[in-house]
Amino acid sequence: MQAYQRDFIRFAIERGVLRFGEFTLKSGRTSPYFFNAGLFDSGLALARLGRFYAEAVIDSGIDFDVLFGPAYKGIPLAATTAVALAEQHQRDLPWCFNRKEAKDHGEGGTLVGAPLSGRVLIIDDVITAGTAIREVMQIIDAQGARAAGVLIALNRQERGKGELSAIQEVERDFGMPVVSIVSLEQVLEYLAEDAELKKHLPAVEAYRAQYGI
């Protein structure tokens, strides 16, 4: 685990974004942990989050031309990542996002920001079922661009309805990498190292044994 990944997990726990206990997921599974990126909800938190995304972008080595934030949650994530890449890594890259509704006045259309062209890095919080990414791929294809990869905050490393995770299905179906700031593997490592949080380790390990990939 890299230093920025350890810092990100600590930061997510401090913000209440990553919590441990008993949570019912949309899938109906009872999970011993929950991740809610919507709680990175202050200016300072968003700025720090962008720096973690930027570190993961650099770490991934993915070659791309433009950042894309899918509406709605991906919009601030793409924006703060673009700022952090420019300020921390001297990489001033274009970014854009889509609207859910087309506008019939002003600039019109469903895309806002830089042109969606060339190699596109999609920025989002998590991939649960992969439905949102499939919709994004249609938008990218319609512009004649191509997806270079997807960057998310947390990879739950968890099977969907079949043997693969939603992330593995996206990688298989679109032939592109999905990378994350951290994965469940690193969360487990962090729990094992933390005297206070170690008590949650057995439940998370049991959950991974049942649903993990």
Swiss-Prot record:
What keywords does the record list, in alphabetical order? Answer: Glycosyltransferase, Magnesium, Pyrimidine biosynthesis, Transferase
Cofactor(s) needed: Mg(2+)
Query: Which family, according to the similarity comment?
Result: Belongs to the purine/pyrimidine phosphoribosyltransferase family. PyrE subfamily.
Q: Name one GO molecular function term.
A: orotate phosphoribosyltransferase activity
Please name the GO terms of the biological process aspect recorded for this protein, alphabetically: 'de novo' pyrimidine nucleobase biosynthetic process; 'de novo' UMP biosynthetic process; pyrimidine nucleotide biosynthetic process; pyrimidine ribonucleoside biosynthetic process
User: Which transformation does this protein catalyse, written as a reaction?
Assistant: orotidine 5'-phosphate + diphosphate = orotate + 5-phospho-alpha-D-ribose 1-diphosphate
- What is the protein's quaternary organization? Homodimer.
Species whose genome carries this gene: Pseudomonas aeruginosa (strain ATCC 15692 / DSM 22644 / CIP 104116 / JCM 14847 / LMG 12228 / 1C / PRS 101 / PAO1)
Q: What is this protein called?
A: Orotate phosphoribosyltransferase
Q: Please name the Gene3D superfamilies in this protein's record.
A: 3.40.50.2020
Tell me the name of the encoding gene. Answer: pyrE
Q: Which PROSITE patterns match?
A: PUR_PYR_PR_TRANSFER
Q: Which domain of life does the protein's organism represent? A: Bacteria
Pathway involvement of the protein, from the record: Pyrimidine metabolism; UMP biosynthesis via de novo pathway; UMP from orotate: step 1/2
Role: Catalyzes the transfer of a ribosyl phosphate group from 5-phosphoribose 1-diphosphate to orotate, leading to the formation of orotidine monophosphate (OMP).
Q: Which residues bind 5-phospho-alpha-D-ribose 1-diphosphate?
A: 26, 72-73, 99-100, 103, 105, 124-132
Residue numbers binding orotate: F34, F35, T128, R156
Kindly list the GO CC terms recorded for this protein: cytoplasm
A Pfam family: Pribosyltran
Q: Name the Enzyme Commission number(s) assigned to this protein.
A: 2.4.2.10
